[in-house]
Amino acid sequence: MYPFKKILVALDATSMDEALIQFASFLAHNTPAESVHFVNVIKSTQLPSSLKKEFPNLMEAAIQDRKKMLEKIIIEHFDMTNHEIKVKISVEQGNLPSKHVLKLAEKHNIDAIVVGRKKKLKNSSVVTQRLARRATCSLLIVPEKEYTNMNRIMVATDFSKESATALQEAIVVAERGTHAGQDVEIICHHVYQVPIGYHYTGKSYDECGDVMQKNAKKQYRAFIDKIDTQGIEIKPLFSWDRNDNVVAVIYEKALQMDVNCIVIGGKGKSASTDFFPIGTNTERLISRDTEIPLLIVRPKHVNAGLMEMLQKI
């Protein structure tokens, strides 16, 4: 686990930016953040040579105008009272926003990338999935809504080392919130299933479900014993997935319990592969049109093949 000291926020000059800036402000003041870097990518346009000759600084002027516009919105929605947090704004030019975001994240050794999820844009998860697979740091996906607190965090766990990392990150956020006078609750949620072929055991479906739950509770005790909870209370939750849809169970429980953020562990990347395997359930959570922020926590790596990978995006 590593603290979120450097945060990169991807803006797109739409109404979504207000929610992103507001959430970035909340995140920065509830983590050990030292800097927040806002970036926006303006689409490259092929201008006729005559127009370029007449207005040689047209694109530069557009970039400066965009930067001034973003500065105004950021001042309105980002809490600047903590002068120790450095705020930077960059406006880039290109046709693939995700590529520029990834390059900036690598260049500035970013710990977490924050991106938005629009309500009305059903295909917005395509860019987000690209970032989730290829970013060398954690990714926070923020739906288009207003945020005022984060007092209930759900960590989806399968008791793996990735889940342990996700829980530790949630503990950091909860600890900061507690110090600020907030009552933050962490729910460690495990979804279990009855395996195919259960009938060969001679037990009924419900009996096998009971066995799986007992086993999950045993695994949880072994899992939580290795975690430094920093005095934060962790509440275990065990849910039985009867319809072969783990993601639906996670999300429905999160809605029922009024969860402010779902945290899940993502895998790291080996030097021999071009993509980060984020896991089937993580990918389905990204694709789902949720109203709850999703934080994908992954180990931070710098690989020799990174630049080659970026060229393929």
Can you annotate each of these PLM segments?
Residues 1-56, 152-209, 228-232, 288-289, ...:
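Small/aliphatic-rich secondary-structure junction motif
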Residues 1-2, 43, 57, 75-113, ...:
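Structural beta-alpha unit
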Residues 3, 26-30, 99-149, 254-308:
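Gly/Ser-rich helix-loop-strand patches that form or flank binding pockets
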Residues 16, 121-122, 162, 246, ...:
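Short glycine-rich, flexible loops that bind phosphorylated cofactors or substrates
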Residues 37-39, 86-92, 140, 187-189, ...:
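General small-molecule cofactor/ligand-binding pocket signal
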Residues 43, 49-52, 56-68, 75-77:
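Conserved N-terminal ligand/cofactor-binding loop architecture of enzyme catalytic domains
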Residues 56-69, 206-218:
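A short acidic, glycine-rich active-site loop
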Residues 181-263:
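Structured core of small recognition/catalytic domains
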